[in-house]
Amino acid sequence: MSDIALTVSILALVAVVGLFIGNVKFRGVGLGIGGVLFGGIIVGHFVSQAGMTLSSDMLHVIQEFGLILFVYTIGIQVGPGFFASLRVSGLRLNLFAVLIVIIGGLVTAILHKLFDIPLPVVLGIFSGAVTNTPALGAGQQILRDLGTPMAMVDQMGMSYAMAYPFGICGILFTMWMLRVIFRVNVETEAQQHESTRTNGGALIRTINIRVENPNLHNLAIKDVPILNGDKVICSRLKREETLKVPSPETVIQLGDLLHLVGQPADLHNAQLVIGQEVDTSLSTKGTDLRVARVVVTNENVLGKRIRDLHFKERYDVVISRLNRAGVELVASSDISLQFGDILNLVGRPSAIDAVANVLGNAQQKLQQVQMLPVFIGIGLGVLLGSIPVFVPGFPAALKLGLAGGPLIMALILGRIGSIGKLYWFMPPSANLALRELGIVLFLSVVGLKSGGDFIHTLVDGEGLSWIGYGALITAVPLITVGILARMLAKMNYLTMCGMLAGSMTDPPALAFANNLHPTSGAAALSYATVYPLVMFLRIITPQLLAVLFWSIG
């Protein structure tokens, strides 16, 4: 068998063994995709014992390409929400998550200086302790750029594997410990979250209001500031028994019922100006109006602002809200449409059908992947990651590398959405498939390279010490920030658990947090809020640590 055939066969075996290990769960928690790393270590041990020779060049290419696929698809997935998560709505959660990253870096630096841990080893421990595989790839990339021998670079994968198991268990232990320390009643926390969940004003709500302010009588909607802005949408108006779709020129009268869509704070302001909330239904049932959800798939409308499409003037149809990448938004007239946006339309059936034709609404297109934008994005990301930045006093030029470059480019392209007829939307199933393929390839090679000396290092070497160092890097930031968030910020326990899981970019921890109260979405919401920024910082941090440690010796 040729070296290439043998290498591919061994990688396939690693994937099978690793995915099987990852699917084994104890009380609902398993290693997940991290099991591939340990599958690689097991197979790598026996490959080394058997004296087999694999193609090192091929393994290197597969490892790097897998990493590129993984970080690129992550960037495309979180891009639409990345910059939004930096705004005020998620500022507090993101600040606590960033603090966890910073404390983890400080603990790593202290351990490195106190115990004289080799640079590749301490970076591997750091990456494993925070269960972040892209951080491992980014660290290995910068070490190679700094001229570190390959044998030393491979040690990073081994120390990563030592620290990884407690990285998963440590966050679960932290959640349990904080629950005991603060005597948390999970049911009470869930009820409190449900009663106050505004996510900084990010959730979209509807309200029916009766016009009671005499100053508004016989005014057109466009002349009422609270209704003429982009924060509140009036999608229906009921006068006596007639339900209609209002336009900016529609004149409102005392006693009219308005169906408003917006964020809770904005709806409250509208209520103060217009009148009291009423329980009267403004349902379209039994009327000549209906509500429909339509998907944007027509390339001709991509990048166009809602106001420029003139749906209200041409078709008497109102867009009441917009869903982008799972996030509900008020359909502001200044919003530019992106491929895959889901619009809530209110209007007559024939008019809605006409608008749907303009927008596309071709469900089959959502399952298709445009491969040209994928490779354009990957290519641009690799180029971005290869740009050297020379800083006086540093031994090597700083680069984003094959982990940082594709990630940042994907974040930017995911946020832009489309350029002309090129759109970077990727169906969730396709995104997940490419992401899983990439991480399986990457971890398979890392495990194979680490497997030969893993047992020896664990039993006869410094493996146990590495596990201890990793436990400190995992536990100290989580416990510290968890206590601060609960005591100082009075953060909801379920929200805090999601934030802790997101700060470690750890899906098994999110699964555990979700199971604390299966019907509450608090943990998932906070996890999604901090995940994009933290993923970016986790990839950049080992590179900064590597250059810092290298420069100060």
Swiss-Prot record:
Sample GO molecular function, one term: monoatomic cation transmembrane transporter activity
Domain RCK C-terminal: 191-276, 279-361
Subcellular compartments: Cell membrane
GO BP: any one term: potassium ion transport
An example Gene Ontology CC term for this record: plasma membrane
UniProt keywords, alphabetically: Cell membrane, Membrane, Repeat, Transmembrane, Transmembrane helix, Transport
Transmembrane segments: 4-24, 28-48, 65-85, 95-115, 158-178, 371-391, 393-413, 439-459, 464-484, 493-513, 533-553
One matching Pfam family: TrkA_C
Metal-binding recorded as keyword: no
InterPro entries found in the cross-reference section: AAE_transporter, RCK_C, RCK_C_sf, Transpt_YidE_put, YidE_YbjL
Annotated membrane topology: Multi-pass membrane protein
Primary site of residence: membrane
Entry superkingdom: Bacteria
Family: Belongs to the AAE transporter (TC 2.A.81) family. YidE subfamily.
PANTHER family: K(+)_H(+) ANTIPORTER SUBUNIT KHTT (PTHR30445), TRANSPORT PROTEIN YIDE-RELATED (PTHR30445:SF3)
Protein's recorded name: Putative transport protein YidE
Organism: Escherichia coli O1:K1 / APEC
Lineage, uppermost ranks: Bacteria, Pseudomonadati, Pseudomonadota, Gammaproteobacteria, Enterobacterales
UniProt gene name: yidE
